[in-house]
């Protein structure tokens, strides 16, 4: 059985890990780094870049460089978070089947397809590191991800060619990575602030059991929002000074984004930093430069409202768990944004105790995911994860009210039934609208999907008995069924989430991803062949020059023709590996023939040399 990899598919960076020989370890990417930027770029040459190479060229290619795609994963285009993303991100967000998608060079891509390209790179890096094929994976999601977002994440894994064994919550994975499952029974809080999402989870650990007591968060709050505060400040200051709005210039905006991200990182260890962006734009008077000094105090004043929101969520979740803060033994800090000093200070103040920062916050979630993979595979025994559903689930009933069937905080997997009836006399069908959220009315919650149960026999309202069953699996993904008890007629819907992707569409995307993988392989082989050909041309031309008059006219003509043919092929940017290698073979053969001829000439002894050799007597000399 092949190894199971654990993947933290992050908003800003992603990480992959594996459990081997009793421990979980992070797998470095081909560039030698432990984390890979969750960035995908489409170049004018038709190449698709992923990770560091994509991030490096973002400034010169902002509209076709995709980052923070996790922020629109599983979102409908009409949701507020989608509208916010459209205003913030430089690439073109559009819709497909009502769900968020992006448009690049006239082609529509879903967030699942973009995320799949990041996952494919992580998969390939893992295969190169382990020296074997990898298919099985455990992928983490923020604890507060809804059903649509979880399903979309699983689809991304499928498109990438992975068999997703489990979708688990990031804080739960972090608890495993810290080894907290092995300690005495105690209550802990995992505070997870990443690039685009925030979660706080209260867990109880002990006797090899990790049980989630309560969870909460914001799927649209993270380090990106800290960056955006800096971007807004820098753009506003520049506009006041020059009258130019940098937000209307996508290339300038991308430079601002990178500068803001770097400033945020520097202010984690320094009290002030300088932002210098020469030639950021130009007007009739000439080029303009942006230069600004930002102090840590100024930065903290920009983000204190966001940090306060996370502290408010801590109080809410600890209360949901039925605990007092004094009962919490450890506070585990997860996610790159927890490096911000203000975040650490406020969380420490909220609990009145030191924070647990013993594991790299960028890697801890992937490490935990690999441990969960080992649990599923059977390499790690006697560890039990008891996760919960982050939001209540129910259906729409008379008056547009949401009737909850599964309350938030219910341990999963779980299955619950509830019986309903008709609202009108002789009603022959009912529509089941499946909802997720905490509000009283359907319109204020997220609709996950709906289906009809038809063929109900005519009867006065309130008489038919319709049993609705909600079944949540270990991934937190929901299946809903409805059955008329009188006739036994039933209808089932596996909630596919907001992605709106059918099984056929997902399969087509899998094939498309494989096709691109094959295209990328061929392109890489052609580049390698081109490099070898350039070396061969240089080597043969050098040899011809050095040998000069020693080369016969016939040999020279043959070699020159083979050289010209190869050079002509290399001028074609689309030349395949096979075409290049065919011309290389011809050149190699004629140049080898030349070498043989030259060698034979050197070997042929002259008459004088032969005569001298005949006079030589073999003897030992004292």
Curated annotation (Swiss-Prot):
Signal peptide: none annotated. The keyword Phosphoprotein applies. Residues 515-537, 575-622 are annotated as: Disordered. Residues 515-528, 575-614 have a biased composition (Basic and acidic residues). InterPro entries: ATPase_NBD, Chaperone_DnaK, Heat_shock_70_CS, HSP70_C_sf, HSP70_peptide-bd_sf, Hsp_70_fam. The keyword Phosphoprotein applies. It comes from the Bacteria. One of its GO terms (molecular function) is unfolded protein binding. Keywords: ATP-binding, Chaperone, Nucleotide-binding, Phosphoprotein, Stress response. Induction: By stress conditions e.g. heat shock. The modification Phosphothreonine is found at residue 197. It holds the Pfam family HSP70. SUPFAM superfamilies: Actin-like ATPase domain (SSF53067), Heat shock protein 70kD (HSP70), C-terminal subdomain (SSF100934), Heat shock protein 70kD (HSP70), peptide-binding domain (SSF100920). Belongs to the heat shock protein 70 family. Acts as a chaperone. This is Chaperone protein DnaK. The gene is dnaK.
């Amino acid at each position: 059985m092949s190894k199971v990899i654990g993947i933290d598919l992050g908003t800003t960076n992603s990480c992959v890990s594996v459990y081997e020989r009793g421990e979980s370890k992070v797998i470095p990417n081909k560039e030698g780094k432990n984390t890979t930027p969750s960035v995908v770029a489409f170049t004018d040459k038709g190449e698709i870049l992923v990770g560091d190479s994509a991030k490096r060229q973002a400034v010169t290619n902002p509209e076709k460089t995709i980052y923070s795609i996790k922020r629109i994963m599983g979102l409908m285009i009409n949701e507020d978070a989608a509208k916010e993303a459209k205003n913030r991100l430089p690439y073109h967000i559009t819709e497909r089947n009502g769900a968020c998608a992006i448009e690049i060079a006239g082609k529509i891509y879903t967030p699942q397809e973009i995320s799949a390209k990041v996952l494919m790179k992580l998969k390939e890096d893992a295969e190169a590191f382990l020296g074997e094929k990898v298919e099985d994976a455990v992928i983490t999601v923020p604890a507060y991800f809804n059903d649509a977002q979880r399903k979309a994440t699983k689809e991304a894994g499928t498109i990438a060619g992975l068999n997703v064994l489990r979708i688990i919550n990031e804080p739960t994975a972090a608890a495993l990575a810290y080894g907290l499952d092995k300690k005495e029974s105690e209550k802990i809080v995992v505070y997870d602030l990443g690039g685009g999402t925030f979660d706080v989870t209260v867990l109880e650990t002990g006797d090899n059991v990790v049980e989630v007591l309560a969870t909460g968060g914001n799927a649209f709050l993270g380090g990106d929002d800290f960056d955006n505060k800096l971007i807004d400040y820098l753009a506003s200051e520049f506009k006041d000074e020059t009258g130019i709005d940098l937000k209307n210039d996508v290339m300038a905006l991308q430079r601002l984004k990178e500068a803001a991200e770097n400033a945020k990182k520097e202010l984690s260890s320094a009290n002030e930093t300088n932002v210098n962006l020469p030639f950021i734009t130009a007007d009739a008077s000439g080029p303009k430069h942006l230069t600004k000094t930002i102090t840590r105090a100024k930065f903290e004043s920009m983000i204190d409202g966001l940090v306060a929101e996370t502290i408010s969520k801590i109080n809410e979740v600890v209360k949901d768990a039925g605990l007092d803060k004094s009962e919490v033994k450890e506070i585990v800090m997860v996610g790159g944004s927890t490096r911000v000093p203000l975040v650490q200070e406020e969380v420490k103040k909220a609990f009145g105790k030191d924070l647990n920062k013993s594991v790299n916050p960028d890697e801890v979630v992937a490490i935990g995911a690999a441990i969960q993979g080992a649990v599923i595979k059977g390499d790690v025994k006697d560890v039990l994860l008891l996760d919960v559903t982050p939001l209540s689930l129910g259906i729409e009933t008379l008056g547009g009210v949401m009737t909850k069937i599964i309350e938030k905080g219910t341990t999963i997997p779980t299955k619950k039934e509830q019986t309903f009836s008709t609202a009108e006399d002789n009603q022959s069908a009912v529509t089941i609208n499946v909802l997720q959220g905490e509000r009283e009315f359907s319109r204020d919650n997220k609709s996950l999907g709906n289906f009809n149960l038809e063929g109900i026999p005519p009867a006065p309202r309130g008489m038919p008995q319709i049993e609705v069953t909600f079944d949540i699996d270990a991934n937190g993904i929901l299946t809903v069924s409805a059955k008329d008890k009188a006739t036994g007629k039933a209808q089932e819907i596996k909630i596919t989430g907001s992605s709106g992707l059918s099984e056929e569409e997902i399969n087509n995307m899998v094939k498309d991803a494989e096709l691109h993988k094959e295209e990328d392989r061929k392109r890489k082989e052609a580049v390698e062949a081109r490099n070898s050909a350039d070396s061969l041309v240089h080597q043969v031309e050098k040899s011809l020059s050095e040998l000069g008059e020693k080369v016969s006219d016939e040999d020279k003509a043959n070699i020159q023709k083979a050289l010209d043919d190869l050079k002509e092929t290399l001028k074609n940017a689309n030349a395949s590996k096979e075409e290049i290698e065919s011309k290389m073979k011809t050149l190699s053969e004629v140049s080898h023939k030349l070498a043989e001829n030259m060698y034979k000439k050197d070997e042929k002894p002259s008459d004088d040399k032969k005569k001298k050799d005949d006079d030589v007597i073999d003897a030992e000399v004292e």
